[in-house]
Amino acid sequence: EELAAELPGSFIAGQFENPANPDAHYRTTGPEIWSDLDGQVDAFVAGVGTGGTVSGTARYLKEQQPSVHIVAVEPAASPLLSGGKAGPHGLMGIGANFVPKNFDRSAVDEIVPVREEDAYAAARLLVRAEGVLAGITAGAALWAAGELARRPEFAGKNIVVLLPDTGDRYLSTPLFAE
């Protein structure tokens, strides 16, 4: 904001509070998922960074089918969304240590806290088993989706998990140290 005050005509995107963020996912991500799966979406899992992806996508999917189960993923070490306290964590991309204005809690059915080591394990499994070089945040979302898939009520159901980051930015981190 200080820089914007100094630079006439500048623009601050404000990704944590700008309603264009969830609206973009309402207009694009949600319809793409719905169309690609011919409306056969039983659950949607996404990490919460700005809150825009999960909130906008959830709003669209729930308009199509109110029973779609929406899962928001947050760091277990900083479980603000589920009523805990902010804390340091290594899940870059989610868990901003405040509740973003763009996070619509009413659109979410469940919040799953994920431990750093579980996110790392899921990201490593994804690269080893599928050849998908995903990042830490993707690992967290995948781990949460796996937990959901193990529940009897989700057996045989279509669970969509959004993998928001690539692993190339983590090659020199503990994620790929093994």
Language model regions located:
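Short glycine/serine/threonine-rich phosphate/pyrophosphate-binding segments
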Residues: 47-58, 137-145, 170
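Active-site/ligand-binding-proximal alpha/beta "capping" segment
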Residues: 7-48, 105, 117-132
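Phosphate-handling active-site elements
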Residues: 40, 63-72, 148-158
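Short, well-ordered alpha-helices that flank and scaffold nucleotide-derived cofactor binding pockets
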Residues: 35, 59, 63, 143-151
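Hydrophobic/aromatic beta-strand patches that form the interior of the parallel beta-sheet core
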Residues: 11-13, 45, 71, 112, ...
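Phosphate-binding loop/pocket of nucleotide- and phosphate-handling active sites
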Residues: 146-178
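Active-site/ligand-binding loops adjacent to catalytic centers
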Residues: 4-9, 63-136, 174-178
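Glycine-rich beta-alpha junction loops
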Residues: 17-20, 49-52, 74-79, 85-86, ...
